[in-house]
């Protein structure tokens, strides 16, 4: 008759215990919980920086249009501005706007609102506005940010507040 140690000798396999696997999963979960908000903030900040760059281009082109024509380009005068903005032209709201994945851009003229460039952040469905970035006639060097409704995430609210406080990112 064989003793117990002889029977189990061929089962001497090196492996992780269930506790060790649970500890690894827990550590990965904690790291993901810490890293995900930072990643989301970096992505949204990158989107906002890109929008600010395009917004400044629209404002500069609109100011050049003003010098040549004595008035700012309105919502229907997008083609008159001497700039290329990547995206598709959207005329569904009246006038011309450039729609990208994340923003809708337009020169708005200096009418009642006093904007010379406007970028509206939209969620993926593109229907509602989350926040808008704009440049006004009164202070063309400063970027302004205004939240729209309750759709903005906490990250978007913080970044918008930062832009509003500093005038840029």
Where do the PLM segments sit?
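Generic hydrophobic/packing signal
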Residues: 15, 26, 46-49, 54, ...
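Alpha-helical interaction segments
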Residues: 28-30, 54-56, 95
């Amino acid at each position: 008759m064989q003793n117990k140690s002889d029977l189990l000798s061929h089962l001497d396999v090196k492996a992780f215990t269930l506790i060790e696997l649970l500890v690894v999963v827990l550590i990965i979960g904690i790291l993901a919980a810490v890293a995900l908000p930072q990643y989301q903030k970096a992505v949204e900040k990158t989107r906002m920086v890109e929008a600010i760059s395009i917004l400044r281009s629209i404002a500069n082109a609109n100011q050049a249009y003003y010098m040549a024509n004595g008035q700012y380009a309105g919502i229907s005068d997008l083609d008159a501005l001497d700039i290329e903005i990547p995206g598709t032209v959207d005329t569904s709201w009246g006038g011309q706007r450039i729609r990208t994945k994340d923003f809708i851009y337009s020169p708005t003229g200096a009418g009642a609102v006093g904007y010379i460039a406007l970028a509206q952040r939209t969620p993926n469905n593109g229907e509602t506005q989350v926040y808008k970035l704009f440049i006004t006639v009164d202070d063309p060097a400063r970027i302004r940010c205004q939240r729209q409704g309750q759709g903005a995430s906490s990250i978007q609210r913080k970044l918008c507040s930062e832009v509003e406080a500093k005038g840029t990112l």
